[in-house]
Amino acid sequence: MNSKQILVIDDEDDIRQLIQTCLEIMGGWNVLTATSGHQGLLLAESSQPDAILLDIMMPDMDGLTTLQKLQANQITKHIPVILLTARGRTSDQRLFTQLGARGIISKPFNPQKLAAQVAAALK
């Protein structure tokens, strides 16, 4: 079993569970999940995962605000973050990269591409 740990932050149960299954089966990674940006920040700080998959569109604290807080925190700023988005415009992707995202995955996603992008972020 791979010892790498991935944190998935997404408010949609079905998407979060699908991503968790893909990462566990295809990558052999240990997966933690959070249902909100607030919960994700707490888990990221306490568990210090090797990578984070973060949904942009969430209630309360959206993914971009969560990303900025992760980047501003001395404990979590080194963790690579891959954003999950339904927004595929090039201008959005440029902004996400400028904010510190290591990668961007568009929804709906291909499970093989998801696992490959996580593997690349872990290198």
Identify the residue ranges that each predicted region occupies:
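Receiver (REC) domain active-site loop signature in two-component systems and cognate sites
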Residues: 58
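Two-component/phosphorelay signaling modules centered on CheY-like receiver
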Residues: 13-32
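Alpha4 helix (beta4-alpha4-beta5 surface) of REC/receiver domains from two-component response regulators
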Residues: 65, 88-105, 116
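Helix N-cap/capping motif at the beta->alpha junctions
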Residues: 33-42, 63-65
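A Lys-centered signature of the CheY-like receiver
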Residues: 55, 107
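Active-site beta3 strand of CheY-like receiver
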Residues: 47-53
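C-terminal output helix
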Residues: 109-119
